[in-house]
């Protein structure tokens, strides 16, 4: 009876050990302007599909595509069937668990490029900022996904600058890239690439790519995606504009790929551009592309339709399948590419079409902002709704100089407190107004929206406040803090781990590494299985 009850447990344990011990996908690395597998140095081309369903039936602002294992189980076979090796996801809910979907994707050999923003937390092209709220959002996604080796990279922005009148917004996205890369490094995570996804505006596209690729490695984008919809119906390399784009980007210096493609002006889409994209004319410059998109919706870009949780492939799916399965791109080796003549891109000069400063916004620093807030006498009252902040800003900044909280991506001039939370910035200008009105009690009221507090300045804050100056027009060099994001429930490993993001940084310093918890689990279960098998052998039920 003992052996009967023990034997299934032994088999289960050994099966689980086999599952946990399975190799993670090798991380994808960058050398020159190409992607390579980290384990063997062979070139990696993106054969991707955008995978995010619009929110139709929920009060939430978006649907997390990797938080529903049943949907992943339903869809991944259809992704596999068309040789998909990358999906792009546009918004992730950091309060959800993604372990099962990420594991299923890994088992299918599929990598993920994830946008760091979400609809309610992104850089606004019309009023751009890079502040603590966004920094905490971006780093929370990094914390959640850093230890999955099938995370290929992150997008810090998508079509933020989309025409010549808002090129200043790119300075804020580039600051986001800089600080996200610094955060990854400071946490000891593996080196995950961070890039940008642009639209295809002929007036700015070359300057846009050059801007993100130029400068010091610490602040430059690691890769560049372009949402390309020029090839419609039966076109050609020249007629589609692909030839022109390839010439435009041939010296970019970082990997470039189509972060979206698949014009639907002619349907069904036959995807005749696939052979060209992965052909010899384009592969020296381009690293593949991501078809837009998996789900059929009102915009008519889908490869499949889903009704009552049942997948039906569309004609586009069949055409894409036949094209993507027939590609044979040439393959470079990382060892040869390292000796390439491709060098760092030169930053674009300011013109009528391009006005983004190479002087980037300061790093959001929670400690600096907290020091400033504590030093104030007049602050916004806690009962004031954040929706009312804009009216208060408008009123105050019409009466005093608010440059200490403002940021200008064209001139490259940024107030010392421009990266702070809105509440802290509002308190700062309220206090300025109060001081400029000789600290009259009525000057700290604003219709009951402000109140007085006892100002405090800790010794550790003196240097910050001195550098910023009383008006906030000085310069404070913010520091990337590693304690801003909350712990999450995801395992953070391609091969299930029980450690949270807050405790796993030391176990993920190299590509493809298992988390400490996974290693412990494997070792423990191996010992259990070994003991169990020894017992069975000892009873003579198995001969060795």
Swiss-Prot record:
<dbReference type="InterPro" id="IPR017853">
    <property type="entry name" value="Glycoside_hydrolase_SF"/>
</dbReference>
<feature type="disulfide bond">
    <location>
        <begin position="232"/>
        <end position="263"/>
    </location>
</feature>
<dbReference type="GO" id="GO:0042123">
    <property type="term" value="F:glucanosyltransferase activity"/>
</dbReference>
<dbReference type="InterPro" id="IPR004886">
    <property type="entry name" value="Glucanosyltransferase"/>
</dbReference>
<keyword id="KW-0325">Glycoprotein</keyword>
<dbReference type="GO" id="GO:0030445">
    <property type="term" value="C:yeast-form cell wall"/>
</dbReference>
<feature type="glycosylation site" description="N-linked (GlcNAc...) asparagine">
    <location>
        <position position="147"/>
    </location>
</feature>
<dbReference type="GO" id="GO:0005886">
    <property type="term" value="C:plasma membrane"/>
</dbReference>
<feature type="disulfide bond">
    <location>
        <begin position="369"/>
        <end position="420"/>
    </location>
</feature>
<feature type="glycosylation site" description="N-linked (GlcNAc...) asparagine">
    <location>
        <position position="59"/>
    </location>
</feature>
<keyword id="KW-0732">Signal</keyword>
<keyword id="KW-0449">Lipoprotein</keyword>
<keyword id="KW-0472">Membrane</keyword>
<keyword id="KW-1015">Disulfide bond</keyword>
<dbReference type="GO" id="GO:0030446">
    <property type="term" value="C:hyphal cell wall"/>
</dbReference>
<feature type="disulfide bond">
    <location>
        <begin position="397"/>
        <end position="402"/>
    </location>
</feature>
<comment type="similarity">
    <text>Belongs to the glycosyl hydrolase 72 family.</text>
</comment>
<dbReference type="GO" id="GO:0042124">
    <property type="term" value="F:1,3-beta-glucanosyltransferase activity"/>
</dbReference>
<dbReference type="Pfam" id="PF07983">
    <property type="entry name" value="X8"/>
</dbReference>
<keyword id="KW-0336">GPI-anchor</keyword>
<dbReference type="GO" id="GO:1903561">
    <property type="term" value="C:extracellular vesicle"/>
</dbReference>
<dbReference type="GO" id="GO:0009986">
    <property type="term" value="C:cell surface"/>
</dbReference>
<feature type="propeptide" description="Removed in mature form">
    <location>
        <begin position="516"/>
        <end position="544"/>
    </location>
</feature>
<dbReference type="GO" id="GO:0071970">
    <property type="term" value="P:fungal-type cell wall (1-&gt;3)-beta-D-glucan biosynthetic process"/>
</dbReference>
<feature type="disulfide bond">
    <location>
        <begin position="378"/>
        <end position="444"/>
    </location>
</feature>
<dbReference type="InterPro" id="IPR012946">
    <property type="entry name" value="X8"/>
</dbReference>
<feature type="disulfide bond">
    <location>
        <begin position="214"/>
        <end position="347"/>
    </location>
</feature>
<dbReference type="GO" id="GO:0031505">
    <property type="term" value="P:fungal-type cell wall organization"/>
</dbReference>
<feature type="region of interest" description="Disordered">
    <location>
        <begin position="469"/>
        <end position="514"/>
    </location>
</feature>
<feature type="lipid moiety-binding region" description="GPI-anchor amidated serine">
    <location>
        <position position="515"/>
    </location>
</feature>
<dbReference type="GO" id="GO:0009277">
    <property type="term" value="C:fungal-type cell wall"/>
</dbReference>
<feature type="signal peptide">
    <location>
        <begin position="1"/>
        <end position="22"/>
    </location>
</feature>
<protein>
    <recommendedName>
        <fullName>pH-responsive protein 2</fullName>
    </recommendedName>
</protein>
<feature type="glycosylation site" description="N-linked (GlcNAc...) asparagine">
    <location>
        <position position="40"/>
    </location>
</feature>
<keyword id="KW-1003">Cell membrane</keyword>
<dbReference type="Pfam" id="PF03198">
    <property type="entry name" value="Glyco_hydro_72"/>
</dbReference>
<dbReference type="GO" id="GO:0098552">
    <property type="term" value="C:side of membrane"/>
</dbReference>
<feature type="disulfide bond">
    <location>
        <begin position="72"/>
        <end position="101"/>
    </location>
</feature>
<feature type="glycosylation site" description="N-linked (GlcNAc...) asparagine">
    <location>
        <position position="408"/>
    </location>
</feature>
<comment type="function">
    <text>Required for apical cell growth and plays an essential role in morphogenesis. May be integral to the pathogenic ability of the organism.</text>
</comment>
């Amino acid at each position: 009876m003992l052996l009967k009850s023990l034997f299934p447990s032994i088999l289960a344990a050994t099966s689980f050990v086999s599952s946990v011990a399975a190799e993670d996908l090798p991380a994808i690395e960058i050398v020159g302007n190409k992607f390579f597998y980290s384990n063997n140095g062979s070139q990696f081309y993106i054969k991707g599909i955008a995978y995010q369903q619009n929110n139709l039936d929920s009060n939430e602002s978006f649907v997390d595509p990797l938080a529903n294992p049943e949907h992943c189980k339903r869809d991944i076979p259809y992704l596999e069937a068309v040789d998909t090796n990358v999906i792009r996801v546009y918004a992730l809910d950091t309060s959800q668990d993604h372990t099962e979907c990420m594991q299923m994707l890994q088992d299918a050999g599929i990598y993920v490029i994830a946008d760091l923003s979400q609809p309610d937390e992104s850089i606004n092209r019309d009023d751009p900022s890079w502040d603590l709220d966004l920094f905490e959002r971006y780093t929370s996604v990094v914390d959640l996904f850093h230890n999955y080796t099938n995370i290929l990279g992150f997008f810090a922005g998508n079509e933020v600058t989309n025409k010549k009148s808002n090129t200043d917004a790119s300075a804020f996205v580039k600051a986001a890239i800089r600080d996200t890369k610094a955060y990854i490094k400071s946490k000891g995570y593996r080196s995950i690439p961070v890039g940008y996804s642009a639209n295809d505006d002929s007036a700015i596209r070359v300057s846009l790519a050059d801007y993100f690729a130029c400068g010091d490695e610490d602040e430059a984008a690691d890769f560049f995606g372009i949402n390309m919809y020029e090839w419609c119906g039966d076109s050609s390399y020249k007629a589609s504009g692909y030839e022109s784009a390839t010439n435009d980007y041939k010296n970019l210096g970082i990997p470039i790929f189509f972060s979206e493609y698949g014009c639907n002006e002619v349907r069904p889409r036959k995807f005749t551009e696939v052979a060209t994209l992965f052909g010899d004319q384009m592969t020296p410059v381009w690293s593949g592309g991501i078809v837009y998109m998996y789900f059929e919706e009102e915009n008519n870009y889908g490869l499949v339709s889903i009704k009552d949780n049942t997948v039906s492939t569309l004609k586009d799916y069949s055409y894409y399948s036949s094209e993507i399965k027939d590609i044979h791109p040439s393959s470079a080796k990382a060892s040869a590419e390292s000796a390439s003549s491709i060098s760092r891109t030169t930053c674009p000069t300011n013109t009528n079409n391009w006005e983004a400063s190479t002087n980037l916004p300061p790093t959001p620093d929670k400690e600096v902002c907290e020091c400033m807030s504590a030093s104030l006498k007049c602050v916004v009252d806690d009962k004031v709704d954040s929706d009312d902040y804009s009216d208060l800003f408008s009123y105050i900044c019409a009466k005093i100089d608010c440059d200490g909280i403002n940021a200008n991506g064209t001139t490259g001039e940024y107030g010392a407190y421009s990266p702070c939370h809105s509440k802290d910035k509002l308190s700062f200008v309220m206090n300025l107004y109060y001081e400029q009105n000789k600290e009259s009690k009525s000057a700290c009221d604003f219709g009951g929206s402000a109140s007085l507090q006892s100002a405090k300045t800790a010794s550790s804050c003196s240097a910050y406040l001195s550098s910023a100056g009383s008006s906030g027009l000085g310069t404070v060099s913010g520091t990337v803090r590693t304690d801003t994001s909350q712990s999450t429930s995801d395992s953070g490993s391609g091969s299930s781990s029980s450690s949270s993001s807050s405790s796993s940084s030391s176990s993920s310093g190299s590509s493809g590494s298992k988390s400490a918890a996974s290693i412990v689990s494997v070792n423990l279960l191996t010992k259990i299985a070994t003991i169990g098998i020894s017992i069975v052998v000892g009873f003579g039920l198995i001969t060795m």
